[in-house]
Amino acid sequence: MADGSDLENNHKPELDRSQPGSTSNGSQEQKDPDEIAPEYATGVRLILVMFTIFVSTILVSLEIGIIATAIPGITNEFRRLDDVGWYGSATFILAAAASPLWGKLFKYVDVKWTYLSAVFIFLVGSIVAAAAPNSVSVIIGRAIQGWGASGVLGGTLIVINYVAPPRNHPLLIGTWMAVFMVSTILGPVIGGGFTSGVSWRWCFWINLPVGGPIIVLLLLFLRIPKHIKKVPATWQEIILALDLPGFCLLLVSLVCLTLALQWGGQTKAWNDGSVIATLVMWIVLSIAFLVTEWFQGQRAMTPFSILTLRMTWSNALFCLISYAALYQVMFYLPIYFQSIHGQSAVKSGVNTLPFLAFFALGAVVSGGVIGKTRYTQPFELLGALIMTAGMALIYILDVDSPQAMYIGAEVLFGFGVGICNQIPMTAVQGFSKQEDVSSATGIMVMCQTLSGAYFVAIAQSLFANRMLATVLSGAGHLDPALVLGTGASELQHVFSGEDLTEVIAAYMVGIKDVFAFSLACAAFAVLLSLIIPFKRLPDHGKKDKPATEEAAEEKSEAEGKVSGDKEENHS
């Protein structure tokens, strides 16, 4: 049996298929008898497959946002205010840690059955959360949902790459991103309807009657083309390739960070021993994770052979930071509407529709244009610039800002982030070798969900600390636990008079700090877009050159240029 560390090298095809006419020994063009011409889904079958996986995305993304308006019902039943932060973060933590594992599974195991497994795990998590007898069970259910959700999201993007004609990838990924974002933001509106009209448990039960037909449709219509072959490996080799030590280190480090941010300044002082200990553990475990990844080589969750490519790491960073800017607006713009303007969850959802509409427009337009031009970097720069301008307008919103002002701000921000948000996935998939697509997709989905796990927790800590400090300085007689435990849409009912004025002012201070953080992330994304290589996506009428070979060509060209300069100087 081959050593697991050489797993990928042991199964490389002898013929270098990225360069027609060449073999491993440099001979003239030969026809590989094992090579199968690509056969992609088209017409009705392509529509049915895309419809099914997009509905899967809707199911998963609704659960990301739906918890926001389900929390009041959960806390009313279980009386565990100290668990509130975990209802949302448990999903992000498991999704972030598990994404690279799913990428490896899609590489070594049948894509169809792996995707079905992810949907099934998500539905199991929904059942656990819906039937939860206590708060801990809700958290466990949400964590299982996150585990399955990461497989569904990554699997959807892999299926698009494998099943759809390559020329359609940018448009389909842009459409997928629009579907994902619209569903995520509509989640709180739907969750509010279930929580107030029936029960918070229906926020999770509703997944079953939708998930069942999805599984049936996947069984009927999902067919992976024959030219897409899984990497042959034994189960022992697959288990080694999953990098379970790296998974555990990343998972525990995220838990430590979340604990520290939820304790610090809210239930415990920042200089409390337990807060300091969890922060130290987060740093130590994060370093241990990076060291483990380095020594794992090709078995790593995030293989450095893929991650160290400039096309990959620059787009991964852009993805991480642009999502940080996006998530804060997604979660805190509705809080702004509900707390500052006294709107209901439904009304605040309606007021985010302009953001959703222009996000979807930007995503579809940029996907279509990139499909024609084959260039990605200019649109990442353009989108980041528009996103930053929109974020600056959102930052200056205040307690008395008129409707025209906040709608204009969210329209500009939504259009900008829609243009650039899905491009990193398109670029990384487009420049990856076929056998690396699943691992590269896992890395990018990890960046998306890590952004939620890290930056949403940081923003929540920033908001809560600043808001409480402002309340205590202006209305010291108020109970901090009451202020924290009162939902944004309930402030008008719980507080009145001067107390209400002070609480609203404190909310505005906390929200502004979060928006400032988001503005900094958007501006940083502009800088990151300048680092991304200016390259045309491979032409699909020819054999595509993977990123690794393009990197080798760049190095060869650079060496040739230096050599030529030396000869000129010598002469």
Curated annotation (Swiss-Prot):
Localization of this protein: Cell membrane
Membrane topology annotation: Multi-pass membrane protein
Ranges annotated as biased composition (Polar residues): 19-28
InterPro entries: MFS, MFS_dom, MFS_trans_sf
PROSITE patterns: MFS
Basic and acidic residues compositional bias, start-end: 8-17
Annotated glycan sites: N25
Protein name: Dehydrocurvularin exporter
Major place of residence: membrane
Role, per record: Efflux pump that is probably involved in the export of dehydrocurvularin.
Single annotated GO MF: transmembrane transporter activity
Family that this chain belongs to: Belongs to the major facilitator superfamily. TCR/Tet family.
Domain of life according to the entry: Eukaryota
Keywords (A to Z) from UniProt: Cell membrane, Glycoprotein, Membrane, Transmembrane, Transmembrane helix, Transport
Stretch list, region Disordered: 1-34, 538-571
Residue stretches spanning the membrane: 47-67, 86-106, 120-140, 143-163, 171-191, 202-222, 238-258, 275-295, 317-337, 350-370, 379-399, 405-425, 443-463, 514-534
Gene Ontology annotations for the cellular component aspect, listed alphabetically: plasma membrane
Short name of one Pfam family: MFS_1
Lineage: Eukaryota, Fungi, Dikarya, Ascomycota, Pezizomycotina
Organism expressing this protein natively: Aspergillus terreus
Gene transcribed to yield this protein: curE
